[in-house]
Amino acid sequence: MLKLNLQFFSSKKGLGSTKNGRDSESKRLGAKRADGQYVTGGSILFRQRGTKIYPGENVGRGGDDTLFAKIDGVVKFERKGRDKKQVSVYAAAE
C-alpha cells in the first residue's frame, strides 16, 4: 500500500507589526474671523495655544487662550508695540 505524507505550509510568512500608522487629530487653531468682518458678541475670533495674539478692546480671553468678541462690531487686527499683535472689536457705526 502506498502511503503519502502531505504537509501544507502557509503561503504567507508571519508579518511583523509596525510602530507607525497613527496621528493625532488636528486642533483647528488659527483665525476664525477676518479683519473688517462684522461679528456678534460671543463669537470666537482666534483659537490658539498660548498668547500668539493678545486681546484688545472688547475682546476676551478664554481658559484655553481663545479670543472672543464681547460686543457686536467689526474685527480689527492690530500691532501692539514692535513685536506683538492684538485683535479688537469696535462697535459698528450706525
UniProtKB/Swiss-Prot annotation:
GO terms for cellular component: cytosolic large ribosomal subunit. Pfam families: Ribosomal_L27 (PF01016). PANTHER family: LARGE RIBOSOMAL SUBUNIT PROTEIN BL27M, RIBOSOMAL PROTEIN L27. Keywords: Ribonucleoprotein, Ribosomal protein. PROSITE patterns: RIBOSOMAL_L27. SUPFAM superfamilies: Ribosomal L27 protein-like. InterPro entries: Ribosomal_bL27, Ribosomal_bL27_CS. This is Large ribosomal subunit protein bL27. Disulfide bonds: none annotated. The N-terminus is cleaved by ribosomal processing cysteine protease Prp. Residues 1-9 form a propeptide. Residues 20-32 have a biased composition (Basic and acidic residues). Belongs to the bacterial ribosomal protein bL27 family. The lineage of its organism: Bacteria, Bacillati, Bacillota, Bacilli, Bacillales. Gene3D superfamilies: 2.40.50.100. Residues 13-32 are annotated as: Disordered. One of its GO terms (molecular function) is structural constituent of ribosome. It comes from the Bacteria. One of its GO terms (biological process) is translation.
